Curated annotation (Swiss-Prot):
The keyword Heme does not apply. Homodimer. GO terms for biological process: symbiont-mediated suppression of host innate immune response. Residues 9-20, 159-172 have a biased composition (Basic and acidic residues). This is RNA silencing suppressor p19. It comes from Havel river virus (HaRV).
Length: 172
């Protein structure tokens, strides 16, 4: 399913299934390919003897439009160059282009989700609020990727990510 699928064929293909979409295709919101580690690499990194428990290989993120979910695993090592690359994995235009393929005239649910260091944050809204959702996703992604392991754990124990108060104030 890595090829680009056009028009109504895309809706039929994506009927109720999770789909990666092809990197560089006309449908996916992502500009980078999936970089999921292989099973062997994952086991080595997450073994009992590993001292790198607080430094994952990367993070998972997804965009969903109605029943269609596009997901990626991207490598991230915490450096400035890696952060810049990760923040460019999708842009407002690529998300809008992908969404336009699946959003009709009716209100459709849209979601952005990111999982990093064991914490997962999902933002959701209707298709009419997609632009606001994209803005929040950009800030959320930047914030989550810049948190230290202790900050992530502290925010999880409080049940809210850093910056959640700002999102609440802006949405009122």
């Amino acid at each position: 399913m890595e090829g680009a699928i056009q028009g109504s064929d895309a809706r039929e293909q994506a009927n109720s299934e999770r789909w990666d979409g092809g990197c560089g295709g006309t449908i996916t919101p992502f500009k980078l390919p999936d970089e999921s580690p292989g099973l062997h690499e994952w086991r080595l990194h997450n073994s009992e003897e590993s001292e790198d428990k607080d430094h994952p290989l990367g993070f998972k993120e997804s965009w969903g439009f109605g029943k269609v979910v596009f997901k990626r695993y991207l490598r991230y090592d915490g450096t400035e160059a890696s952060l810049h690359r990760a923040l460019g994995s999708w842009e407002r235009g690529s998300v809008n282009d992908a969404a336009s393929r699946f959003l009709g005239l009716g209100q459709v649910g849209c979601t952005y989700s990111i999982r990093f260091r064991g914490s997962c944050l999902t933002l959701s809204g209707g298709s009419r609020t997609l632009q606001r959702l994209i803005e929040m996703a950009i800030r959320t992604k930047r914030t989550m990727l810049q948190l230290t392991p202790s900050e992530v754990e502290g925010n999880v124990s409080r049940g809210r990510p850093e910056g959640a108060k700002a999102f609440e104030k802006e949405s009122e």
